[in-house]
Amino acid sequence: VTPEQLHDFLCNPHSYPHQPAQAELIQTHTSYVVIVSPYVYKVKKPVNFGFLDFSTLEQRHYYAEREVELNRRLCADIYLEVVPITRQGNRLTLAGDGQVVEYAVKMRELSKPDFMKTRLARGAVGEEDLLRIVAKLQAFYAQQPTTPEIAECGRIENLRQITDENFQQMEPDIGQTLSWSAFETIRFYTNSFYAQHASLFAERRQTGRIKDGHGDLHLEHIHLAPDAVCIYDCIEFNDQYRCVDVAYDTAFLAMDLDYNDRHDLARRFVRHMAAALDDPGMLRLMDFYKCVRACVRGKVETFRSNQPEVDAETRQQSQERARRYFRLALQYAVAGSAPTVLIVMGNVGTGKSTLAGRLAAELGWEVYSSDRVRKEMSDLPLHRRSSPAERGRLYTPEAKAEIYEQLMQRAEEHVQAGHSLILDATFSRRRQRDQMRQRIEQVGGVWSVIEAHAATATMKERLAARSTGTGAVSDARLEDFDTIVHAYQPPYEIGLRQLLPVQTEGPLAGTISAILNDLAARQVRRS
């Protein structure tokens, strides 16, 4: 049967025995899903992505049966049967006579308002819902045996095979949905985590934490009806993707909540799961598995965007989602899940604003610059140097204190909302740095400091160039050099665990990659 014939058959309401009023077709990169109330039919596409192979009719039949069998574990009443699609002459029929050309999984339709993603969008997911999901998963995992074969899926060699395949499949996306720096950093973080935490992975296997689980536990696969929680569409096509650490399943849903800007729910869900499973050790793996899962989702969105039948608007939306997932993976690799304030400081002309801007683009974080805040507060043009009279007002001790107070307030607001950000300012006085660190910690944030450095000649060249250029926001020029440099107090009070000195005279791309890799290495050591 051709794709066009199958498409037309599935979209025709008369193809179904119960004669629905309409047939709504949804395509994924692996299947056709047809909503024909009160049922849903799902037909696998003849695709082969390496980790998933539906290329023959026999394989599609086998995996359709596996889908029903496996999903009945968590959603018993929804998965009904596997129905053959047959052909007699040019006519296709569900469960008819003739040659079998495809197989469809038949399911009961779930109420649209109760899908977790839909409820989350209208602000209707709360603590009680999290506890219902946790209770469902706790009972499920308790019923799943841990055999030696299943435990092997948690071995580093097997996990590395999966992540290496991810990186191989992500590589064509470099320059489109993720940068080379992000790709290299995520790969470095992943392999460094394996190397430094081998004993942790071994302990997870030995203590029975590897289960025949779900493997694809995200918002779109959870249905929260008033009387039942249904967790459906587990992975049937690859046992190694489904037989995972319980921390891996937990991390997937937590990552998806982060992606949807519900960091509060993500943190509470992880905390409840660790308590319910008596598994505090999962917390050490959470950022690692979140990073892996964000990469998988980015990869899946890229696959979806590359499908030939996808229209231009859907392709663009999938690519943007892929970018967001890959940025999220990078955030986990360099900063973990806690709201982070990355302070980019340094003397005049060291290139800190350039660093801050590029890091913000890579990480998807907002950046607040003291130079920009100063001019916005005074309603002055950003790219015009302030007049001598204006500078006399803007750079008094009181005015400087107000600028740093504004930066501190913005940092507090972001951290309290669960968001990370970048601050770009000289931070030339120890008092400013101490106050910032104290206030970030008081609201539950973490912080790191990048101090930009450059040779004196380079700093002066950059300041001189501002006099002839038009793009600088900063008012500092070459005549201000000695005054600013002499007032700068190096951050000797900050230990090297949180201070990263950076030379800015090399190629910018290489400097950014080195910063991201260094931050990732620190994140691995903190885990």
Where do the model's predicted regions map?
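Small-molecule kinase domains that catalyze NTP-dependent phosphoryl transfer to phosphate-bearing small molecules
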Residues: 465-514, 522-527
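Hydrophobic positions on the alpha1 helix immediately C-terminal to the Walker A/P-loop
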Residues: 355
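Conserved lysine of the Walker
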Residues: 352
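ATP-dependent phospho-/nucleotidyl transfer catalytic cores
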Residues: 51-55, 92-97, 105-219, 223-340
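Hydrophobic anchor at the beta1->P-loop junction of P-loop NTPases
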Residues: 344
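A glycine- and Lys/Arg-enriched "phosphate-lid" helix/loop adjacent to the NTP-binding pocket
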Residues: 386-397, 441-491
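Conserved substrate/cofactor phosphate-moiety recognition/catalytic segment
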Residues: 360-419
